[in-house]
Amino acid sequence: MKRIFLLIATNLAVLLVASIVMSILGVNTSTMGGLLVFAAIFGFGGAFISLAISKWMAKKAMGCEVITMPRDGTERWLVETVARQAQQAGIKMPEVAIYQSPEMNAFATGPSKDNSLVAVSTGLLYGMSQDEVEAVLAHEVSHVANGDMVTLTLIQGVVNTFVIFAARVVAGIINNVVSSNDEEGEGLGMFAYMAVVFVLDMLFGILASIIVAYFSRIREYRADEGAARLAGKHKMIAALERLRQGPESTAMPAQMSAFGINGKRSMAEMMMSHPPLEKRIAALQAR
């Protein structure tokens, strides 16, 4: 109940702030043009703010310990491997971090190719062979080299804009229909209108999530291909086979999970940010 209340309160707060900002800027959201400007500012604004603070958020959320000075041979090998792969991929050396988690996972994040972070869990670092870890690192470096963080941020901005715009257009149509059938012509009223917008935001948000997940799966196949080039196809297949034998990934927040090696499994593949491991293995074997 508290989670639902916070979700509703957050949504209403965003709408309130958005309305105030649009008023200050003199944008009339009652027109299609004004509404589109409103939707684009908040759709892309939120996505790019998340991208800008992605490294900071990842470090805080996952408790990442950035390796500034390797303490042992394992950490030294980890840093040297990422450095070599980054040079091969033509990108600036990412920060390398370890986070405490028994599950085998890793992720890459950061606002650009030259300002990124590659992090691995202790479960992966000490639960996989060195060849398998090397392949996972190559997968994450490939995400950075392919510019996946920026690409998915742009896609997220587009779908956010669609959700905000479409929800308010449909709510306006509903309000006009109610108003035309109302003798007093008052329409839905402010609170009913906001409730309709909230529900439509949720419904269109589900559709948007499906679109983003589709593009995320495509980027995963590309990162697997990049890893095969950097570390070797057989090493990447071995790493995916090891992940397939392990439990489902559960501990990573959604923002980091999108660029992790091991995604959450779902009955509905279209909602998954990662393709099933079986399909990823088959795609590599077919290369």
UniProtKB/Swiss-Prot annotation:
Coiled coil: none annotated. InterPro entries: HtpX_protease, Pept_M48_protease_HtpX, Peptidase_M48. Keywords: Cell inner membrane, Cell membrane, Hydrolase, Membrane, Metal-binding, Metalloprotease, Protease, Transmembrane, Transmembrane helix, Zinc. One of its GO terms (cellular component) is plasma membrane. It is a multi-pass membrane protein. The chain crosses the membrane at residues 4-24, 33-53, 154-174, 195-215. Binds 1 zinc ion per subunit. CDD domains: M48B_HtpX_like (cd07335). Its EC number is 3.4.24.-. Its cofactor is Zn(2+). Its main location: membrane. Zn(2+) binds at H139, H143, E220. NCBIfam families: PRK05457.1. Belongs to the peptidase M48B family. This is Protease HtpX.
